[in-house]
């Protein structure tokens, strides 16, 4: 499919409300670096989460006179939140040609997260995905012949224009985004649920998120992505990501947990090494992040465990482990790792199946 395939019909005029719940996700093979209209420089592959979700409701009413601007109001956690308006306005400008009926309507948007907004967990993926799904549901109401397959592709396509990683928050439990020889139907335009063989051990995998720092990052992901444009190691990294995507596909089929641990942790540390080797350079890990990583390594060696970590573009740590180890790992977290978390907070989550209509 190409971009023009997603250009929507003009003249759709509907009233009503659409509500969706969309999950966050955690990349195993990392997306870092973009080009053009929110296209990834390399493929990424992620676990869709189950409990860390955004719930969004959009009420559409037809405007008496369509304007050249967008008409909307936004509330978060039940309170009007004008500080979000610039980001939503920018998103609407990016998707305008694909959903040209937006300017014919006033949108009343209400959103909330299942996790604290100030937790340090990136909510843009779940939030933008949920908003895109709500908007596309309205389009489907006006164009009921839209197929389920096309609906999911276009929802991911639109979500990508709000936040790159949001492209991976429509489906589940494992999603790839970015053209890759390893997955025939992969695309730079949208995320795709992985339909190849997945070993049973990964079907109920756990992710406990240690909230090391709940504050705002000193360097945004957008800035970090842009620093890859002239990065000394960019070409090597993009090649590595393609190779790791192919390797991870094989690991997911075989259930080789030793190989999974090695690849996932290498990807996490590579992401932060790229930040430290950028110009200008920056560090998003905190001292407590490193303390946790060393504790995880010690625990794994001592207990013959498959517990491993991954990191997003921040200080928090995602601990990944098989469901069979849940009891022992949670005990370890409470006894030895919670003290490194801000206010002792962590969130227990697991692999999920993607967005759902409410």
Predicted features and spans:
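ATP-dependent small-molecule kinase catalytic core of the GHMP/sugar-kinase superfamily
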Residues: 147-301, 305-307, 324-335, 340, ...
């Amino acid at each position: 499919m190409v971009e023009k395939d997603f250009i929507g019909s003009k003249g759709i005029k509907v009233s009503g409300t659409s509500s969706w719940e969309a999950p966050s996700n955690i990349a195993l093979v990392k997306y870092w670096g973009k080009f053009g209209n929110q296209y990834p420089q390399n493929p990424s592959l992620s676990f869709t989460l189950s409990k860390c979700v955004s719930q969004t409701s959009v009420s559409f009413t037809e405007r008496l006179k369509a304007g050249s601007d967008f008409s909307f109001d936004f509330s978060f956690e039940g309170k009007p939140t004008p500080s979000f308006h610039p980001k939503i306005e920018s998103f609407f400008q990016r998707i305008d040609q694909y959903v040209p009926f937006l300017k014919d309507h006033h949108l009343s948007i209400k959103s909330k997260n299942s996790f604290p907004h100030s937790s340090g967990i990136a909510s843009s993926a779940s939030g933008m995905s949920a908003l895109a799904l709500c908007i596309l549901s309205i389009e489907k109401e006006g164009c009921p012949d839209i197929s389920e397959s096309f609906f999911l592709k276009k929802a991911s396509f639109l979500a990508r224009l709000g936040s790159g990683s949001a492209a991976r928050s429509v489906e589940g439990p494992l999603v790839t985004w970015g053209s890759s020889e390893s997955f025939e139907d992969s695309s730079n335009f949208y995320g795709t649920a992985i339909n190849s063989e997945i070993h049973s051990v990964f079907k109920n995998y756990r992710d406990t998120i240690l909230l090391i720092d709940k504050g705002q990052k000193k360097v945004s992901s957008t800035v970090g992505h842009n620093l890859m444009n002239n990065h000394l190691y960019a070409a090597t990294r993009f090649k590595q990501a393609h190779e790791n995507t192919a390797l991870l596909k094989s690991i997911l089929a075989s259930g080789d947990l030793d190989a999974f641990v090695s690849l996932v942790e290498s990807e996490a540390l590579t992401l932060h090494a790229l930040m430290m080797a950028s110009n200008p350079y920056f560090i998003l890990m905190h001292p407590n992040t490193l303390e946790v990583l060393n504790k995880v390594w010690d625990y794994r060696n001592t207990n013959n465990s498959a517990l491993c970590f991954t990191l997003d573009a921040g200080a928090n740590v995602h601990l990944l482990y098989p469901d069979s180890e849940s009891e022992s790992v949670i005990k370890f977290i409470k006894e030895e790792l919670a003290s490194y978390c801000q206010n002792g907070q962590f969130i227990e989550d697991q692999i999920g199946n993607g967005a759902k209509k409410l």
